[in-house]
């Protein structure tokens, strides 16, 4: 396995914003402790604030007048000079030492095949087996799988990551409505861990549907408080508050959806007396203020409808939606060339 100075190949991109500056000290405290390559450059993507941490090479990339997430992401990526980038979010708090061997191995695998887009830390929810263990501990994500584009930690080929972003995209839109863009590039290959234990970073996301770190802008203290106490990290939880409730979305019935004020996650609706999609949408709009893109898999009997829903840009009215079914992806691609 070829080894050389990793800083020539890899940059760390930490996606954040000024409003989350209180996360930076605990994030970089743990990053410095558990990340083995101190000389690898780090880009902190935020609007206007500056930050430094002793022993780490951090450069803040600012977009003070730009509110669009996609535009800020493209600006940050344009400042990355290395071929590969490790994508991280500001609440991905490392829990264990990162293996040098694993990182070098992934970089060398990517060098050996220029069509590899990423090696992710997130096991894919798909049950399909595809190129399992071609790269030990990983499997290839099947073409056109949902959430192939995602904001989980991953080592990306910088050029390909930049290729998939759009200036107006939010993170939620990018993971869902823009996911069909991968069909325009069938040559690209995406790999994910076979199991969580195979991930090359441990940042606390252990099972599909878990919430950890920061959720809806508030601390998930069930996750972070034991970690911060173990690591002797002091955090003022009052700055952003504590998330008061557990995840309520799994196995939620349409008949009880009134308990949910808004939805930003995949919602499983089952065992409902409501039989038509029209009735479901009417029920959701009655009880939920939905202002951002989301994807809802509806389980009605044995039939699965995957509906992609987004508010039309011309109006902020919650009643205006566009629906893109899987079978309509070709039309979507042709309109986004």
Regions found by a protein language model. Give the residues of each.
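N-proximal low-complexity "stem/linker" segments adjacent to membrane-targeting elements
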Residues: 1-25
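Active-site-proximal specificity loops/subdomain of glycosyltransferases
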Residues: 45-81
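C-terminal catalytic/acceptor-binding lobe
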Residues: 169-335
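Conserved donor-nucleotide/metal-binding helix-loop-beta segment in metal-dependent transferases, i.e.
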Residues: 98-119
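Short beta-strand-to-loop element that shapes/binds the nucleotide-sugar donor at the catalytic cleft/hinge
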Residues: 117-132
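Conserved nucleotide-sugar donor-binding
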Residues: 82, 149-165
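Short, acidic, metal-binding catalytic loop of nucleotide-sugar glycosyltransferases
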Residues: 29-39
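Short aromatic/hydrophobic "clamp" motif used to bind/position activated sugar donors
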Residues: 85
């Amino acid at each position: 396995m070829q080894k050389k100075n990793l800083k020539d190949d890899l940059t760390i991109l930490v996606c954040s914003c000024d409003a989350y500056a209180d996360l930076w000290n605990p994030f970089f405290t743990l990053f410095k402790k558990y990340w083995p390559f101190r000389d690898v450059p780090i880009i902190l993507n935020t609007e206007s604030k500056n930050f430094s941490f002793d022993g780490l090479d951090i450069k803040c990339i600012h977009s003070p007048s730009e509110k669009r997430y996609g535009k800020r992401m493209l600006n940050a990526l344009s400042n990355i000079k290395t071929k590969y980038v490790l994508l991280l979010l500001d609440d991905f708090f490392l829990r264990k030492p990162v293996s040098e061997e694993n990182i070098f191995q992934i970089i060398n695998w990517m060098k050996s095949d220029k069509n590899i887009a990423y090696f992710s830390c997130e096991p894919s929810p798909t049950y399909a087996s595809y190129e399992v263990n071609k790269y030990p501990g990983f499997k290839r994500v099947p073409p056109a799988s949902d959430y192939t584009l995602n904001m989980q930690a991953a080592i990306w080929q910088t050029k390909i990551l930049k290729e998939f972003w759009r200036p107006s995209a939010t993170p939620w839109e990018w993971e869902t409505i823009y996911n069909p863009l991968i069909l325009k590039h069938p040559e690209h290959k995406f790999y994910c861990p076979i199991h969580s234990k195979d991930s090359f970073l441990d940042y606390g996301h252990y099972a599909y549907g878990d919430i950890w770190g920061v959720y809806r802008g508030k601390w998930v203290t069930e996750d972070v408080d034991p970690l911060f106490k173990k690591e002797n990290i002091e955090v003022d939880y009052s700055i952003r508050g504590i998330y008061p409730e557990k995840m309520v979305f799994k196995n939620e019935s349409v008949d009880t959806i009134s308990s949910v004020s808004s939805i930003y996650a995949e919602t499983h609706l089952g065992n409902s007396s409501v039989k038509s999609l029209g009735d479901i949408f009417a029920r959701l709009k009655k009880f939920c203020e939905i202002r951002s893109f989301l994807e809802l898999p509806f389980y009605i009997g044995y039939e699965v409808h995957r509906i992609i829903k987004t508010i039309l840009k011309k109006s902020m009215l919650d009643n205006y939606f566009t629906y893109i079914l899987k079978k309509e992806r070709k039309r979507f691609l042709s309109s986004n060339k």
